[in-house]
């Protein structure tokens, strides 16, 4: 069973407006006028979770544009649906970058000699170009998976007071480099890693956000002084059309405890985090999404750890769902089931984290063919820096075989 090909709800209305008013190109990046106004204790190397195993559980974004006298016609829509940007609906194919310096790409970590994007532009340009050459149309890039170093400034009370000296310029340089590489970006703001307790590692303080998320005033400071300036930095870039979506947080369920109010299994948090209840995380994500809506026209999603918690974010204002897949998840929520099989029919679904080497029961080519044929809206592998030549070649072969329906 396939989900509806068109985006629903808010995204459908935006897409309808784009179809009536927008103009778009047919390959590469979208026309600037349309896409530029779219509505769319861990170690230093950080934690990549995705272990949403266990039993229980169950089972496109849209874009808008300024008025134009030219009708918007998509001449190469994805088979079975996808993510809509401007007037183009494509299977959103890409790779997790996911970082060059964990928690240091945007702002840097001076004490560890970890520099931000601007200072390492040549390295990032090479990596982005490599992803594009391997068929990726989007790179999922982590921003603040932990808050440390110079990325965020705190006041004397320990509350977020603004972005660091180079954070804004690093964001804008990332967009410029994406333009040069002809690749689009999905910035992932936070991760469950942020919920590790505050600590000192090698003279560098890492600030855990559980106390910020659960206090209304401190949460407001985080959003007003960090989230909104990040979104504004994107919108002020001449290359803002390269920003296709915000992933608000990577695998939030791994920083949650207690029951789900929507009927999913109870949460099973990472043992090293300071977990919060569903209601507390949902409030944080709702507030963050509201701020992103106010200051950015990019699409919005939440990087759910697995189909185990398929209902977790169904009442939030996101444009499409993203879920993660690995061998443990696959034991209980097999990769070869459609979104509709898991009870998800209201919004597009992208698999935004799965091994570049594939699963024990399916190589990457088989995974991609399954998701493409069963109505998923996209697939973003983990991760470019982990991929070998054969895996990159397999992903490129998938794109070449499917053609323009998987290329933005």
Predicted regions and their residues:
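Ser/Thr-rich, Pro/Gly/Ala-heavy low-complexity intrinsically disordered linkers and tails
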Residues: 1-8, 13-72
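Sequence contexts marking disulfide-bonded cysteines in secreted/extracellular proteins
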Residues: 25, 71-77, 86-88, 403-405
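Acidic-residue sensor for enzyme active/binding pockets
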Residues: 45, 55, 66, 247, ...
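Active-site mouth of glycoside hydrolases
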Residues: 75-318, 324-331, 345-347, 354, ...
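Active-site-adjacent beta->alpha loops and helix N-cap segments on the catalytic face
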Residues: 334-336
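Ras-like small GTPase catalytic G-domain
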Residues: 341-342
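Aromatic-rich peripheral "rim/lid" segments of glycoside hydrolase catalytic domains that contact
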Residues: 362, 366-408
